[in-house]
Amino acid sequence: MIKVFHAGYEVIKEPDVFRGRKNADLGQGFYTTDNREFAYRWVREKSGSDTVINTYELELEGLKVKRFERDEEWFRYVFSNRRSLPDELADTDVVIGPIANDTIYNTLGIMTSGYLTDDEAMKLLCIGPCYQQITLKTKKAAEHLKFLSSEVLGSADLEKNRKIIETEEKAYLTEFAKVMEELS
């Protein structure tokens, strides 16, 4: 059993695994993380909406689980999903793997522009911190998820987290520019 967190704009006691985007890193599903601090930093403020962190327990026993590391297999799976190709793991209950840092720091266009080789794009995706995402892809997985609580974040929390992300992004973009220069 692991504790997982979902950042969003509403309390979600029973997630819909078919609601998410098909072209997200790990395909369509309900995205969570086991890193509480990252969940708090990941969420963005949305005008007219509460900013909510939902907390759950996930029982992995009895589920078909695929785990990725930051490697070529992960890279190919993420890029396949980003290109909206058929999801080869659609029948897997839970997919666990790193978040592609371009998602966090808005550099996707450079990586998917076609101007980089796959090796160069992967090198760029591996810059920066490695945060895990845990994606529930089937109804069976959702049935193994137990809602524990939700918390509405206030403006002070959101501002503090925004500053942390800004600092991380600045360091990431500095390293990104350095690697881009090396690739030129």
What is each PLM-predicted segment?
Residues 1-25, 50-54, 61-62:
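ADP-ribose/NAD+-binding catalytic cleft of ART/PARP-like enzymes
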Residues 4-10, 28-34, 108-112:
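Short linear motifs at secondary-structure transitions and domain/linker junctions
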Residues 21-46:
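Extended catalytic/binding region for NAD+/ADP-ribose chemistry, centered on the ART fold
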Residues 24-25, 45-52, 58-184:
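Conserved NAD+-utilizing ADP-ribose enzyme module
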